Amino acid sequence: MDNDGALGFGAILRNDVFLAAALSLFMAQFAKALIVLLTRRKAGIKEIFSTLLWKTGGMPSSHAALVISITTSIAFSSGMASDVFALSFFFALVVIRDAMGVRRAAGMQAKALNTLGLRLSKRIHIPFKPVKEIHGHTFPQVVVGSLMGFFIAMAVNTL
């Protein structure tokens, strides 16, 4: 490690890829928490706090914001012809496809299973424990998250 802290904590705070990614993730989760606060009449502080920290699904997609900001920042720092840009680009495609496809489908199936299980539980008195419903993203949620990530990365890398 040299005197300017190139391997220390200070270096990561000067890293535009890290800054854009962290800011995009935070801003997307903050927007999600704000939407919950404005649309749910009885949203408590616990729900707002949990949304801000780790809730998945909803508007905007923090997954999309994060991976698009990383890819955009890498395009600035390493160039679009670099290996690391190609890696980040395809990583972003996989993450977005998973958030919009696999996770969304799994969440819809879990919701259907829970509905069926609760109905059967009431009808024939079989104990039922609901499965976790994973929340994926819709196309508009992914588009908004992607735009957030892109513009935040542009701002971090050009200002």
Predicted stretch roles:
Residues 26, 47-159:
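Membrane-embedded catalytic cores of phosphoryl/pyrophosphoryl-handling enzymes
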